[in-house]
Amino acid sequence: KPENENEEALHE
């Protein structure tokens, strides 16, 4: 699971 995707979800 990519950590980058997790951060993007937090931005939204």
Curated annotation (Swiss-Prot):
One of its GO terms (cellular component) is extracellular region. Its main location: secreted. It comes from the Eukaryota. Keywords: Secreted. Expressed by the skin glands. It is found in: Secreted. This is Skin secreted peptide P4-1.
